[in-house]
Amino acid sequence: MADVIKLRKGLDINLKGKASMDVTLQVEQTEEYALVPDAFVGVTPKVVVKEGVHVNSGDALFVNKACPEVKFASPVSGTVTAIERGERRKVLCVKVKADAEQQATDFGKKNVDVLDGEAVKNALLEAGLFGYINQLPYAVSTTPDTKPKAIFVSALRDMPLASDFEKELEGNEDAFQTGLTALSKVAKVYLGVGIDQHSRALEEAKNVEVNVFDGPCPAGNVGVQVNHIDPVNKGEVVWTVDPSAIIFFGRLFLTGKVDLRKKVAVAGSEIKTPGYAEVLVGTPLSAFVADQLKATEHVRLINGNPLTGVQTDMAGFVGGHTSEITAIPEGDDKDEMLGWILPRTSQFSTSRSYFSWLFGKKKEYDLDARVKGGERHMIMSGEYDKVLPMDIFGEYLIKAIITGDIDKQEQLGIYEVSPEDFAVAEFVDSSKLELQKIVRDGLNTLRKENA
């Protein structure tokens, strides 16, 4: 029987517009797809194709400059139409015009039961899928020279408006199990599931240790699960893998081909019919989101969930780790009489400043993107600890990162954290600090120092 880990710290934020499991959204046929390097944190891309070249799905579009073995596969077959660059020639995306009849590079079917760890890694490297594996410390895309003491997969997505992985798992059970079995050849695999998830593919997963997490957000964060099961110390490495990527891996071993289809939630109060769309990595958002928006102005479109996602627009694409596209009010057209002084019941408050807490925890809120205040000194103490279910002193770690005290950061557990672990803390922070950016900057600095 799976171990149940009860977490008490955290905060569930119920927003209007959660995607319905029963609604399947139409995806318009599109010719152009794009692979975005920024979706793979820590990767400096080196483009290995030229405009006008024809590629098959599974062929590399770019590699990790620091480790050229790590390739990133094209989601479709077609002609490379553009390599878009930004400031200082930064690669923004590689665009491919899809063929009418798709062709995939055949890497050969493999029986994962007879493979060893090196064979699994080599197969993922060859097919351009290895870069979907992240690591702690530093919360970046990993490289094949790392030796993980364990591999963590969290099937629990509990951020506001997050997609339900059980929806994506439907019809992909065999691929999911195959992917888990493959990774178990590299290191011990821990699968984290939620107390309310009852899919047999999760509860009865083989070749892994299943742990059930019962608690508020961010219980589904893989970093939180690592902290409670097998914390990362200096000099140690664990791999963390998105469950969607596990399905990608499984399909590769079962079919010998790269198949980057996934079910993405389209959610938020600004969406007409919140539901799920089956898309490829690299699909333009305009193909399945444009017709679903209630309005085109005063709307914040987010590639991801409202707490950890990235602001985008209709020119954006589904990222390698995207599991939901959300749309919430921007809030720039609001004119509230008396501001926060006016008593109200429709606003969310963790400190019970409004009467909305009387309606219970299940009340849904239509929150907008406003910060409602400027950055200020850290005066309130203990705010982070109430919503950070990890065995670290979050407030002191943030202060150590701000002051650049690397020794103190290491003592306070920076190797165990990733930016999204502080997403809820950032939401409740009365100092209005960008905690996720602070943590990311600290991890980047530490990574350079230890290189």
Predicted regions and their residues:
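Mobile cofactor-carrier "swinging-arm" domains
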Residues: 1-15, 81, 86, 94, ...
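Short, solvent-exposed loop/turn positions at domain surfaces
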Residues: 43, 49, 66-69, 273
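Short, well-structured beta-strand-loop connectors
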Residues: 49-63, 82
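Glycine-rich, histidine-containing beta strand-loop boundary motifs that form or position
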Residues: 59, 65, 76, 84, ...
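Buried, small/hydrophobic-residue-enriched core segments of structured protein domains
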Residues: 70, 84-451
